[in-house]
A protein has these predicted regions:
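A generic structural signal for tightly packed, nonpolar segments enriched in small/aliphatic residues
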Residues: 1-160
Length: 160
């Protein structure tokens, strides 16, 4: 792996965790939630998380759960071009970041996707924006939000 920026270390640790749980456990899906990229804040602001997934059914279930508990998420793409950027290294099998300036949240998700077994439903929630609010919104005070706790519970309660 070509490590392109040592300040983007979170995705390396998360990739290890994704690999580890697949080797150690019988899984029917993987959901990771983390404050991964500032790029998602640029695209969605601080009130909606970025959702990336290799599975439409899982993505829809997560968006529905988020709507129900007022923890919004928006599905973002992992395009073929994002994956090509991750796989385009002159010195390694893959890069930890994309090759360009744009689409940082998408290329970060494309990087994580490389560690998920092809047939395993997976979703990644980038909560870099939603993890902290700059002002009080409804019942959520300024500061740390706990975003994702209610969404995760709702999703698990309704998981088939």
């Amino acid at each position: 792996m070509e490590v392109c920026n040592t300040d983007a270390e979170g995705r390396l640790i998360l990739a290890d965790a994704i690999s580890y749980v697949q080797k150690q456990y019988q899984l029917d899906s993987i959901l990771d939630i983390c404050t991964l990229t500032g790029a998602i804040c640029v695209g969605l602001g601080e009130y909606t998380a970025g959702l990336f997934s290799n599975n439409d059914e899982m993505a829809t279930a997560l968006m529905d759960a988020g709507k129900k508990v007022q923890e919004r998420c928006w599905r973002m793409p992992i395009e073929e071009e994002h994956e090509e950027e991750i796989l385009n290294s002159n010195v390694a099998d893959l890069r930890s970041m994309g090759t360009g300036r744009y689409g940082g949240a998408c290329t970060a998700a494309a990087f994580l996707k490389q560690f998920v077994k092809n047939d395993l439903p997976w979703a990644h929630l980038d909560i870099a924006g939603t993890g902290m609010y700059s002002k009080t919104v409804d019942w959520v005070p300024r500061g740390g939000t706990g975003y994702g706790v209610q969404l995760l519970i709702e999703w698990l309660l309704n998981k088939k």
